[in-house]
């Protein structure tokens, strides 16, 4: 950490880019997070090849956290806190394989095709509301902070009349401005709602993710596993997509010559979305990997039990990844970025995220071809304390 920026090195950003000191840190380096009695030392990987090696090797690196000193690294475990049951990132194969296989019915190609018309409808509903409010308007408040939650509720199977309440509970138990007691109460209410919904789905499976899983696997997927996975889906999909929408629009407005990619064919839009995902990389890092044994990585001696943090934004700006990698180029052929992770923990919802972003950006410029920054000289307000990078406000005009 530095006096100028107290945040851990792996989450430092400057505008749309990773911080210079993060990019200059080296392929694999030691970092300290926290201070005093709370200080923890980790390895931090920034090179694309090293990040892929760590995330892709579940034999040597575990994602499962130990909550008991007797628990072997990456073992089946003797204790997992309730909040981590169903969180795929806290499971290693074969546990991970078993659970992920049961959850894939909610993310099939058929499921994504069924979701497409709804996503288009919710995006246009939000754009209608923004247009009615008049120019200028805050794109974050009207679109970026609204679309992802609505899409995720449809995916999971939350009844439409419950969705406003459901999202308030989801956001409330993460709100750092609330007391710990209040957040815990909201989190408990959120969990109880999910368990009640799962019980209903077991009696009469619907078309959402929970219904698809219980229809195919029944009691083989436990209530707690389904509850935990729903929490993971909501937390990962909401913040990440909100961040990508805001930053993506800002990036395109700063590079207006590239907006035509979303006015052309679907293949051009798909390529543009993939480049925006790589260039912006809103998640800072996945769950730290724990070395299962002594090993050598990028010339460094890693000890069994050492923690490795993988910086996804830095890895996706590694000059070894592609020529001119610091430049946004939506016509670039897709390159093997790690914004969705890598290996067995590659994001299960990657196809949904791409579909959602492609719909938002395509419909936005179809509806508002003259969209522009309301005040190009205004300082941009970035979210610095949320799990994924994003904007607090983006005033646009048309």
From Swiss-Prot:
Enzyme Commission number(s) from the entry? 1.14.-.-
Q: Does the keyword Cytoplasm apply?
A: no
Q: Keyword Oxidoreductase: yes or no?
A: yes
GO terms, biological process: vancomycin biosynthetic process
Q: Which CDD domains match?
A: CYP105-like
Report the superkingdom from the record.
Bacteria
Pfam families (UniProt xref): p450 (PF00067)
The alphabetical list of record keywords is: Heme, Iron, Metal-binding, Monooxygenase, Oxidoreductase
State the needed cofactors, names only. heme
Name the pathway it acts in. Answer: Antibiotic biosynthesis; vancomycin biosynthesis
**GO MF annotation: an example:** monooxygenase activity
Please give the PROSITE patterns that the UniProt record associates with this protein. Answer: CYTOCHROME_P450
Binding-site residues for heme, renumbered to this chain: 347
Instruction: Please give the family membership noted in the entry.
Output: Belongs to the cytochrome P450 family.
What this protein is reported to do is described as: Involved in the coupling of aromatic side chains of the heptapeptide of vancomycin.
Q: What is this protein called?
A: Cytochrome P450 165B3
């Amino acid at each position: 950490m530095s006096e100028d920026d107290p945040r851990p090195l792996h989450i430092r950003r400057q505008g749309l880019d990773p911080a210079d000191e993060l990019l200059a840190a080296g392929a694999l380096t030691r970092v300290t997070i926290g201070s005093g009695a709370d200080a923890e030392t980790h390895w931090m990987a920034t090179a694309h090849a090293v990040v892929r090696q760590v995330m892709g090797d579940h034999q040597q690196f575990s994602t499962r956290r130990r909550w008991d000193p007797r628990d072997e690294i990456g073992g089946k475990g003797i204790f997992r806190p309730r909040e981590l049951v169903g969180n795929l990132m806290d499971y290693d194969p074969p546990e991970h394989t078993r659970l992920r296989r049961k959850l894939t019915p909610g993310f099939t190609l058929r499921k994504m095709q069924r979701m497409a018309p709804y996503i288009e409808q919710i995006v246009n509903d939000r754009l209608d509301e923004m247009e009615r409010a008049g120019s200028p308007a805050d794109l974050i408040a009207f679109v970026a902070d609204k679309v992802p939650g609505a899409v995720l509720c449809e995916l999971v199977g939350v009844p439409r009349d419950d969705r406003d309440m459901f999202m308030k509970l989801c956001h409330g138990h993460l709100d750092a401005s609330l007391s710990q007691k209040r957040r815990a109460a909201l989190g408990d209410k959120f969990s109880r709602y999910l368990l009640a919904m799962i019980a209903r789905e077991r009696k009469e499976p619907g078309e959402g993710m929970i219904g698809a899983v219980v229809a195919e696997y029944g009691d083989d997927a436990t209530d707690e596993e389904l509850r935990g996975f729903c929490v993971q889906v909501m937390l990962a999909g909401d913040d990440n997509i909100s961040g990508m929408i805001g930053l993506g629009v800002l990036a395109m407005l700063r590079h207006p010559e590239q907006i035509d990619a979303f006015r052309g064919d679907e293949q051009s839009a798909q390529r543009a979305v993939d480049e925006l995902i790589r260039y912006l990389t809103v998640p800072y890092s996945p769950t730290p990997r724990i070395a299962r044994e002594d090993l050598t990585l990028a010339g460094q001696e890693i000890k069994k039990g050492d923690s490795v943090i993988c910086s996804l934004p830095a890895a996706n700006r590694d000059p070894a990844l592609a020529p001119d990698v610091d430049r946004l180029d939506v016509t670039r052929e897709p390159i093997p970025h790690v914004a969705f992770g890598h290996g067995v923990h590659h994001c299960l919802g990657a196809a949904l995220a791409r579909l959602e972003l492609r719909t938002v950006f395509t419909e936005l410029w179809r509806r508002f071809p003259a969209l522009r920054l309301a005040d190009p000289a205004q300082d941009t307000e970035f979210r610095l304390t949320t799990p994924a990078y994003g904007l607090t406000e983006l005033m646009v005009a048309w």
